[in-house]
Amino acid sequence: MYTIEKLKGLFASGKIGRRDFIQGAVALGATISAATSMSSSVMASPKKGGTLRLAMSSGTTTDILDMSVSTGATSELVHGYAIYNNIVEVAADGSVVPELAETMETDDAKTWRFKVRKGVEWHNGKSLDVNDMMASVNYHRGDDSKSSIKGQLAEIADVRADGDYLVIELEGPNSDFPVMLSDYHAPVQIGDSNGKLKDPLAGIGTAGYVLKEFNPGVSASFTRNPNYWKAGHAHFDGIETTIVSDATARQQALMTDQVDCIDDV
């Protein structure tokens, strides 16, 4: 015989949908409002563990982990967001908030100061520092830069370190400037002693998942970062992505439980 707790377990594991949960809860004596509230509570409590298997429509052998030249293909975006964080990010309400920066401040919208967040480790164990952030911004500047957002960041006049702060001087005031630092082309990567990125293709980041294997245009696998600094994120033990360009094949893979989700339905 079913109980409310049994129904919660089935709903949390995905074995029944929200409608079935509410109908079952009402049948057991709960009011519709109470059943709806319980379903929302279960949905708001993520279950940790397991491996997310994702089949994606787009991906080629030219896919790379250097997001500065990403074409915006689904595969590159999924891999990039799994691996990297930015200096700032866009919150759910559309506002720009600090990410790898602990604070963000400006008095005139021309000089911007970003304090490096303490306690953040790269996937290789190195601690995040201001040189990493400085090298990551400069990677999009200069005649030799191939970055897709080189033009948008041309308004930067100077980038320097001031203790634990990254200081960015603009040619003129721009209150919207931080938005550019949240772009998927502009993740923070490891800098070297010469002020340049150590290896933009290495796929070493600070985000929730550590790259395990990468076969461009074919597949990739990740394991959860045990030292991820963001609480309440990265719930899966691992992620596996596979490129399946044929829509029918993607749907068949989903229906036969070969994957957990697909894109471009």
Q: Can you annotate each of these PLM segments?
A:
Residues A92-S95, S182-E240, D246-T248:
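Gly/Pro-rich hinge or "lid" segments in bacterial periplasmic/extracellular proteins
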Residues E105, I149-G191:
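Surface-exposed binding/hinge segments that line
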Residues A55-D107, N138, I204-T206:
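N-terminal lobe/hinge region of extracytoplasmic solute-binding protein
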Residues E102-K146, V167, A253-T256:
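Aromatic- and charge-enriched surface segment that lines or borders ligand/interaction sites
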Residues M1-D20, G29:
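N-terminal secretory signal peptides
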Residues G49-G59, T111-F114, M133-S136, L166-I168, ...:
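Short, well-ordered beta-strand elements
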Residues V259-D264:
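Paired acidic/hydrophobic, glycine-rich loop segments that form the ligand-binding mouth/hinge
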Residues K15, T36-T60:
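C-terminal segment of N-terminal export signals and the immediately downstream linker at the start
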